[in-house]
């Protein structure tokens, strides 16, 4: 290899065998047996190969569509519990990508979209389920918050911005974006304020539902290209949203009361009323499992919007046992992540069983579900993570129940096998 000349050719002017440029016109000239190639031609070849790989990859992805069992098995590695929701999601996602693989009407039958509605409390795993599937399928994934969306022409975020975000995730590759997954969170927050159609404009509730209808069902959205505002003369990108899988999720607080009103067999008041004791009351999770589309209409979603989300999955509230599992069992469990961080310092991190129970209890008290676990663990480990890089000869850090409760500091075990509480000196 040489910059401007090759070994054995010191007095001879060399040229690129591909483009014909001399060694003085290029930065690098790579020598082979009686052949030379310049850095510009190498870069050009790389670009051509990249473009060809980009064209081939969607087809390869389609050929390797995992079965519902394989999708479910992958979800089990990262998400604890929620067995029914996993099964529903796996089948819906499989059917969606099978529809894309076999595009066009099948024997005159046009297959509809299998968009999904996830109902479950905060921190039950709605976002994680969608994100994990997208990562496994190697498709672009983006999230949107329904509470920030408004109808076009009003202050706020237009629904078309969701597609713009998806394009950004795949470097504005339209073909890739059209195979992506969009998760819209807090969908329950855009329910209309009453059952009856209002004469006033509801730009953040029913208005957003109307705006999302076409996008979710399938339309060709015109999205400005990268840096579109700086280059207004560029043509808009046309994205077919009928190929994009939309997953909507929400806590739907109070929905259980709507379901109970529908399913109640008692008269409710008077001498003939059916009175139920505390022991007869079903849990909120059990009640939500009985949800029907009519309940969602009563809650405030318009019938047309519910019709665009035919797949319904309910997630149960996580109990203490599930939270303890989430802390330690998944492949990317929080305790494993922090153990890896400590390992980078050459220190072993151990969470005792009573510590995991205490962390789960804290999360239940805060009513944050699995979402709050990380912030709790961060708080517990903050001081030791601050001091550890400056402390020598620490071999192991142990976290027990008293550390979680703030009654003591983490136990440090040194390389000479002596142990003491952090900061005890």
Swiss-Prot record:
Record GO biological process: cell division; proteolysis involved in protein catabolic process
Binding site for Zn(2+): 16, 19, 38, 41
NCBIfam families assigned to the protein according to its UniProt record, in alphabetical order: clpX, PRK05342.1
Listed GO CC annotations: HslUV protease complex
Protein name: ATP-dependent Clp protease ATP-binding subunit ClpX
Gene Ontology MF, one: protein dimerization activity
Main function: ATP-dependent specificity component of the Clp protease. It directs the protease to specific substrates. Can perform chaperone functions in the absence of ClpP.
One Pfam assignment: AAA_2
Membrane-crossing segments per the record: none
UniProt cross-references to HAMAP family, sorted A to Z: ClpX
Keywords: ATP-binding, Chaperone, Metal-binding, Nucleotide-binding, Zinc
Gene: clpX
Similarity comment: family membership: Belongs to the ClpX chaperone family.
Record domain ClpX-type ZB: where: 4-57
Gene3D superfamilies assigned: 1.10.8.60, ClpX chaperone, C4-type zinc finger domain, P-loop containing nucleotide triphosphate hydrolases
Residues engaged in binding ATP: 121-128
SUPFAM superfamilies documented for this protein: Glucocorticoid receptor-like (DNA-binding domain), P-loop containing nucleoside triphosphate hydrolases
Natural source organism: Shewanella sediminis (strain HAW-EB3)
Self-association state and partner proteins as the record states: Component of the ClpX-ClpP complex. Forms a hexameric ring that, in the presence of ATP, binds to fourteen ClpP subunits assembled into a disk-like structure with a central cavity, resembling the structure of eukaryotic proteasomes.
């Amino acid at each position: 290899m040489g910059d401007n000349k090759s070994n054995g050719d010191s007095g001879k002017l060399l040229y690129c065998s591909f483009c014909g440029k001399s060694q003085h016109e290029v930065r690098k000239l790579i020598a082979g047996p009686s052949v030379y190639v310049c850095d510009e031609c190498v870069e050009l070849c790389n670009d051509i190969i990249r473009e060809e790989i980009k064209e081939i990859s969607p087809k390869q992805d389609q050929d390797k569509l995992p079965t519902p069992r394989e999708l479910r098995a992958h979800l089990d590695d990262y998400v604890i519990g929620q067995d029914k929701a996993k099964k529903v999601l796996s089948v819906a996602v499989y059917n969606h990508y099978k529809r894309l693989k076999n595009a066009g009407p099948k024997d005159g039958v046009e297959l509809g979209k299998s968009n999904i509605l996830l109902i479950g409390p905060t921190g039950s795993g709605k976002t994680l389920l969608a994100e994990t599937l997208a990562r496994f399928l190697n498709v672009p994934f983006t999230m949107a918050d329904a509470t920030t969306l408004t109808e076009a022409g009003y202050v706020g975020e237009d629904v078309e911005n969701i597609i713009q975000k998806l394009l950004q995730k795949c470097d504005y590759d339209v073909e890739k974006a059209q195979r992506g997954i969009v998760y819209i969170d807090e969908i329950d927050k855009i329910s209309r304020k009453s059952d009856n159609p209002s004469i006033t404009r509801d730009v953040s509730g029913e208005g957003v539902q109307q705006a999302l209808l076409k996008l979710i069902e399938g339309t060709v959205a015109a999205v400005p290209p990268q840096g579109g505002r700086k280059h207004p003369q560029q043509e808009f990108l046309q994205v077919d949203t009928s190929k994009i899988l939309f997953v909507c999720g929400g806590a739907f607080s109070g929905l259980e009361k709507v379901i109970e009103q529908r399913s109640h067999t008692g008269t409710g008041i008077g001498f003939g009323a059916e009175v139920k004791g505390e022991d007869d009351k079903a849990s909120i999770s059990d009640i939500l499992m009985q949800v029907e589309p009519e309940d969602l209409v009563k809650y405030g979603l318009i019938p047309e919007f519910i019709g665009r989300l035919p797949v319904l999955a309910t997630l149960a509230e996580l109990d203490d046992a599930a939270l303890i599992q989430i802390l330690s069992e998944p492949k990317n469990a929080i305790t494993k992540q922090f153990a890896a961080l400590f390992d980078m310092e050459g220190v072993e991190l151990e969470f005792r069983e009573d510590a995991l129970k205490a962390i789960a209890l804290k999360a239940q008290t805060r009513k944050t579900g699995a979402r709050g676990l990380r912030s709790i663990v961060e708080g517990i480990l903050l001081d030791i993570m601050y001091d550890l890089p400056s402390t020598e000869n620490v071999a192991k850090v142990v976290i027990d129940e008293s550390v979680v409760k703030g009654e003591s500091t983490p136990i440090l075990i040194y390389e000479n096998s002596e142990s003491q509480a952090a900061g005890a000196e």
